[in-house]
Amino acid sequence: MARAVGIDLGTTNSVVAVLEGGDPVVVANSEGSRTTPSVVAFARNGEVLVGQPAKNQAVTNVDRTIRSVKREIGTDWSVEIDGKNYTPQEISARVLMKLKRDAESYLGEDITDAVITVPAYFNDAQRQATKDAGQIAGLNVLRIVNEPTAAALAYGLDKGEKEQTILVFDLGGGTFDVSLLEIGEGVVEVRATSGDNHLGGDDWDDRIVEWLVDKFKGTSGIDLTKDKMAMQRLREAAEKAKIELSSSQSTSINLPYITVDADKNPLFLDEQLTRSEFQKITQDLLDRTRKPFQSVIKDAGISVGEIDHVVLVGGSTRMPAVSELVKEMTGGKEPNKGVNPDEVVAVGAALQAGVLKGEVKDVLLLDVTPLSLGIETKGGVMTKLIERNTTIPTKRSETFTTADDNQPSVQIQVFQGEREIASHNKLLGSFELTGIPPAPRGVPQIEVTFDIDANGIVHVTAKDKGTGKENTIKIQEGSGLSKEEIDRMIKDAEAHADEDRKRREEADVRNQAESLVYQTEKFVKEQREAEGGSKVPEDTLTKVDAAISDAKAALAGTDIAAIKSAMEKLGEESQALGQAIYEATQAEQAAGGAPGGESTGASNSGDDVVDAEVVEDDQERK
């Protein structure tokens, strides 16, 4: 049975994990790191870069590098590059494709099934869009799981059968969630969840950038916000400074040649940022985490003292001010230090994948819907059918009637949110039930059913009890992608994957050819410069020279078939040269007699050993 992976598709970084012998293992990417930057870049030569390579070139390719796209998923945002619009789903799919490739390389087998995590406070549109991204990447998304739930699963599965209350405080690169869960006897049940989908480490970075811009403007009079390349350098420096301030009391931010003045003289940015100043300029961001925390405690109906464990998730929780605030809000409870905040979500996703595949037994995951769901009724009121923090999957029905006499149809508008007025909530979608027989208002019986699956994705049905007519909508308005569009994007992604594969193959062929040319050229030169002259006739060397010239000419062009052909020809000629040298050496030894032959052979052998060692050492240094 093919294995399934667990993927934490993050705003800043993403992680993939898999079960090995029943235990979750975080898979290192092709660059050797356990986390992959969620960055996608479109190079000028048509190559699509993902992860660290994309992040590395961001300064010189600002307009064609996309980061933190998770903040836009489930919206109609898009970016135009080379005349083509890319949706958040397509950009996210690039990151997922890289994680998929890295997992396949690690396991040595194809991967098709995956569990992907999302912030607990993601609405239906964002969940559907994440699932679409997985589909575009060639993955069968077994389940969409809430990040705090996955973290609790990873943390609590080995904590015995005693029931425990766990608070998960998840502050990532772009989103914030806080969830309260009960864990015991293999059951992970979410009691309540809340959050903010636009609060994360990126916001802390932005505050440092703003601080640097103000400081630089104050000393030089130049506004760096008008310089895209300078702003990208500031963002990277801000992220680095934020990380350093997690372990140091102050950090130096030094950016030479950040811009030039009116006389084209280079200007430098050199500032010292202290942890206290950093905390001062970001205090309001920190305070925004208080309300969701209080909401979760209230919704779960418990006191802070009943929390057994506090688990911090997301790289942003490494900031001392964050862990101190959590400690304060939980009545002095020390957050658990036994989990890696960057990896625990992917580990939990891998465990859930194992549950769905039957590899992990006796585990039941009971998640909740983060926001209430309902329809708009007369007067623009939001009538809730499913309250927030209801365990999913779930199904609820309620009967409504018409507002006017002889009303032939009803418009069902589906909303998600907590406001009493429907228009103040998030409109997920709408559909119409037609063919209602003429009748006075209040007589027709329209049954509306909400069905939420285990992924948190909503299906709504409206049925006229009198006629049996019904209409159903699967909410995907927020994702904005039809099946045809998803299919097209899958084909595009596959085409790009083929292009990338072809480009890699071409690079490999070119590298092999260049290496063969260099080694053969060097060998021929050594033969001509050898004491006593070459051991082989000049016409043999001339043939090799010609093959080298042909290979160089092919390398100057773009025809890979020509390079392969020239490389094969050069390989044949260099083999013939090697054979000729071997035969000449044997003939010399036979003519020179045993003692002389042995002496010459020993000397050559010694030289060969020394050369080999030097080459190996040199390669290691590289």
Curated annotation (Swiss-Prot):
Pfam family name, one: HSP70
PROSITE patterns the UniProt entry points to = HSP70_1, HSP70_2, HSP70_3
Induction summary: By stress conditions e.g. heat shock.
- At what positions is Phosphothreonine found? 175
- Region annotated Disordered sits at 494-513, 587-622
Q: A Gene Ontology MF term for this entry?
A: ATP-dependent protein folding chaperone
**Keyword Lyase attached:** no
InterPro entries for this protein: ATPase_NBD, Chaperone_DnaK, Heat_shock_70_CS, HSP70_C_sf, HSP70_peptide-bd_sf, Hsp_70_fam
* Key words, A-Z: ATP-binding, Chaperone, Nucleotide-binding, Phosphoprotein, Stress response
Biased amino acid composition, Basic and acidic residues: 494-511
User: Which superkingdom heads the taxonomic lineage of this protein's source?
Assistant: Bacteria
Compositional bias segments (type: Acidic residues): 608-622
Hey, which family's this protein in?
Belongs to the heat shock protein 70 family.
Q: What does this protein do?
A: Acts as a chaperone.
In terms of HAMAP family, this protein maps to: DnaK
Q: What is this protein called?
A: Chaperone protein DnaK
Q: Which organism is it from?
A: Mycolicibacterium gilvum (strain PYR-GCK)
